[in-house]
Design a protein with these regions (language model features):
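Core catalytic DNA strand-manipulation module of type IA topoisomerases
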Residues: 1-39, 44, 48-421
Length: 421
């Protein structure tokens, strides 16, 4: 401990080194072995059923976590969905458009064209400006990357599969040849922690102040710690703030550069001030109908200075409107729409679902998705999972014989019990 204090290190900064040294003398833990055996038993209860395999015309090679995830993808609500008609009304004015918000004191829900025409016929030629309000709000930065959030963000922003993300991250972690030496550019990429070490944060904040100004220096928000978080390693971050993406770009492949830039900028952003956005809202009354229009402007870019290219922000301006005055629209328009079924899972959403429900661990998310793809239980259409015929049949049979074992609740409780052991 005295050595830690002299070096200004925290215990967690040297935890990995300590554990690696201790591992050489580690004896087999009987409780861990029992946990592994218990997990294996629940897997084999699924994979060893010959009668089911014969009905499916193939051997079942799914773990309990794979089966639960496949069952999650095969959403019965989507299969039985029936679309419903609805209508929208908008009023176009000089320089802005307002959408119908309320009708007769209730949220506007126009089910058919006759109801819509009734509303349109009740409108006067002019709209009354009932309220004009402007408010500033903070747009907070997100937490540094865990394994799960890295896979999700890389899927959304870079179009990487979870497997590709982990392979590229592994390479960045193991080391890149930078001229005369091999350097690991990121910390360990299998983690569920939002922590950043003080050893990293101090120089990172100095870099932010020097590069962007003191007004951009923020602090790491304390993210809520979930019940299943083990917190063994700190979050995924660059090993050195000095290794900027521009500096190391010539040593990296295209994919390595894209992922490293994402990790570097996300880590930097989480130590910066929030962005400040001004939102102006206008409410327009016309008899029993209330319309609203909103616009937002960027007051202070904050963390968006480095992370803005990864986040969409629609900026617009409303003309000067005076409360308690009347304005005439250029046009009032009705449009027909139909409800859509719940969206099928993307890789990013499935990973988030597994994390939220406690299905598996960060190290298993990618393998679960890869298994479902390789076994052709699902296909990918427009970045979304579509269950194959074999996948549907497999889910039906698993639900018939193993409805309890593949349930989300059972799988999450099993993970918790095994962690406790």
């Amino acid at each position: 401990i005295d050595i830690f204090e002299k070096l200004e290190l925290e215990d967690d900064d040297v935890l990995d080194t300590y554990l690696n040294a201790m591992f050489e003398k580690l004896q087999i833990d009987s409780q861990l072995a029992q946990a592994s055996q218990g997990d294996l038993a629940s897997q084999e209860s699924i994979t060893s059923q010959e009668d089911i395999a014969s009905q499916l015309k193939e051997e079942i090679k799914l773990t309990r976590k794979d089966s639960t995830s496949l069952n999650d993808i095969f959403d019965k609500e989507i299969e039985k969905f029936e679309e419903e008609e609805f209508w929208r009304v908008k009023a176009e004015f000089e320089g802005f458009t307002a959408q119908l918000l309320n009708y007769k004191g209730k949220k506007a829900e126009l089910k058919n064209e006759s109801e819509t025409d009734e509303l349109l016929n009740s409108l006067n030629e002019e709209f009354y400006v009932q309220n004009v309000e402007a408010k500033n709000r903070n747009r907070e930065t997100k937490a540094p990357f865990t394994t799960s959030s890295l896979q999700q963000e890389a899927s959304i922003k870079l179009n990487f599969s979870s497997r590709k993300t982990m392979l590229v991250a592994q390479k960045l972690y193991e080391g890149i040849d930078l001229e005369s030496e091999t350097v690991g550019l990121i910390t360990y990429m299998r983690t569920d922690s939002y922590r950043l070490s003080n050893i990293f944060m101090a120089p990172a904040k100095k870099y932010i102040e020097k590069t962007f100004g003191k007004e951009y220096v923020g602090s790491l928000k304390q993210a809520k710690k979930g019940p299943n978080v083990q917190d063994a390693h700190e979050s995924v971050r660059p090993t050195s703030i000095d290794n900027t993406p521009v500096k190391v770009k010539k040593y990296l492949s295209k994919d390595e550069f894209s992922l490293y830039s994402l990790i570097y900028n996300r880590t930097l952003a989480c130590l910066m001030k929030p962005a400040i956005i001004s939102t102006t809202s206008v409410e327009l009354k016309n008899n029993d109908a209330l319309f609203r229009s909103q616009a937002q402007a960027l007051i202070f870019d904050g963390y968006l200075k480095v992370y803005g290219k990864y986040e969409s922000l629609e900026l617009s301006v409303l003309p000067e409107l005076v409360k308690d005055t009347n304005i005439k629209p250029l046009n009032v328009e009705k449009t027909q729409h139909f409800t859509k079924p719940p969206a099928r899972f993307t890789e990013a959403r499935l990973i988030k679902e597994m994390e939220d429900l406690g299905i598996g661990r960060p190290s298993t998310y990618s393998q679960t998705i890869t298994t479902l793809k390789n076994r052709k239980y699902v296909s990918i259409t427009e970045k979304r999972f579509i269950p194959s015929d074999q996948g549907r049949l497999t889910v039906d049979k698993l639900e018939e014989f193993f409805s309890k074992i593949i349930s989300v609740d059972y799988t999450a409780r099993m993970e918790k019990v095994l962690d406790d052991i």
